[in-house]
Amino acid sequence: SGGMQKRAAIARAMALDPEVLFLDEPSAGLDPSTSAGLDELIRNLSESLGVTFVVVSHELPSIFSIADTVIMLDKKTQGIVAQGDPRELRDSSDNPLVRQFFLREAAGAEVT
């Protein structure tokens, strides 16, 4: 399954004992339950082994599950739009691009 393939890829990368691991859309194409399990695995590996994960994602449930810090980029300017705790950005950002992202994405995702 897709979830097992992604877990195996992470396991292969972790065998190299990295300090930082880059994951590009790790939960893309997975059903919500499998995605949540993968998010939990990433979070547990980060906490237990001290590995920093840099995760590229557009999926709010994953962002809120995994991220301690979010850096949002603007596709047009290729610059940083906002940076910080994902919940603080969601709840208090005055930046229209940040607000638009969270509003657009929240329409299909439950985030606590």
Regions found by a protein language model. Name each.
Residues 15-19:
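A short, proline-enriched helix->beta-strand linker immediately N-terminal to the Walker B motif
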Residues 21-24:
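Catalytic Walker B motif of ABC-type/P-loop ATPase nucleotide-binding domains
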Residues 32-34:
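Helix N-cap at the start of a conserved alpha-helix in ABC-type nucleotide-binding domains
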Residues 36-48:
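Helical segment within the ABC ATPase nucleotide-binding domain
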Residues 57-58:
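H-loop/switch region of ABC-family ATPase nucleotide-binding domains
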Residues 63-65:
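A short, surface-exposed alpha-helical micro-motif characterized by mixed small hydrophobic
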Residues 76-102:
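Conserved beta-strand-loop-alpha-helix hinge in the C-terminal portion
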